[in-house]
Amino acid sequence: MTTGAMPFSYAVSEFTTMPWTFEEDVTRYAALCVDTIEVCEQKLDPARAAEQMAIVAEHGLTVCAVQPRVRTFFASRITPDPQSLAERVAMLRGSIERLARFAPGAPFIVNTGAHPSGDMADAMRVVTRELARLAEVAADHGVKIALEPLNPTSVNVESAIWTVDQALDVIEGTGRGEIGLCLDYWNIWQNEGLDAAIARAGDRILSVQASDWRRPRSFADRIVPGDGAIPLGRLMRLTHAAGFRGACTVEIFSLDVADSLYESDLGDVITRSRAGLEAAWAAT
């Protein structure tokens, strides 16, 4: 066992508190001593987005990452429309152009989406090409883009890739420093060769997300860090050793289950999540 505080700032994704409004997220996160927020664009009113984003800094928070309204290149279960690749890329570009000034240096998180014919190789080629093009937009606006490999339960539904190494193959294929990795422990903790993959990622890790695992009973069944099977402390140590010094973001989805965390005290979820991460770090 080692001593010392968890070396990452504490962040919460707005997906964790889906029942709350954007304004409630900001004010309540600040009151709960959350350091930084992962903004979910779907919570913003397009007519008031600039006004809403301005209150983040007013409450002493920073933006550690942005989840665009459309964040996959191919259509997905969560965001099926528009179907056109060009339209989806245009929407992603628009998200960067609108929100980057409120999130300097932060990554915009994307994943591949589901290739219409299940062609993983083509999906990786297309996403590599489109990310390389979007890197110019990110560079012009002072932000980055983080590609997230999803859990195998999402393959051909939300994603064509499910391992850190697959994501890194795409990232490295862009040849651009603005493109990096979103490392979500719930998605990748069962990958073979994970230790080596995290080491390979190194300074390409732009975002880290945490929750915990029980055998899923729905498409969205994540639990509070420390309450499940993921070796969070070990994964945080590997991530730290790879050079990451950013925020550890609690990202929980909890839908279509009898004990949905969305129907519980979400302030308590935020508090318990921080305690779970700190305990996991201290225990390794």
Predicted feature descriptions by range:
Residues E38, A65, F108-I109, A146, ...:
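Conserved beta-strand positions in the central sheet of alpha/beta enzyme cores
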Residues M1-C33, A57, G94-E97, P104-G105, ...:
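Histidine-acidic metal/acid-base catalytic patches
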Residues I78-G180, Q190, G267-V269, G276:
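Active-site acidic/histidine proton-transfer and metal-coordination neighborhood
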Residues T16-M18, E41-K43, R69-T72, T112-P116, ...:
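Active-site-proximal loop/turn and secondary-structure-junction residues that shape catalytic pockets
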Residues T2-E14, A65-R77, T112-H115:
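N-terminal small/glycine-rich loop or linker at the start of catalytic domains
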Residues R28-A47, Q67-T72:
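N-terminal substrate-binding region of glycoside hydrolase catalytic domains
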Residues T72-T79, P116-M120, P152-V157, P216-D221, ...:
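A short acidic, helix-capping loop that chelates divalent metal ions and anchors anionic groups
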Residues E38-E58, G118, V155:
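Glycine-rich, proline-tolerant flexible connector loops at the mouths of alpha/beta enzymes
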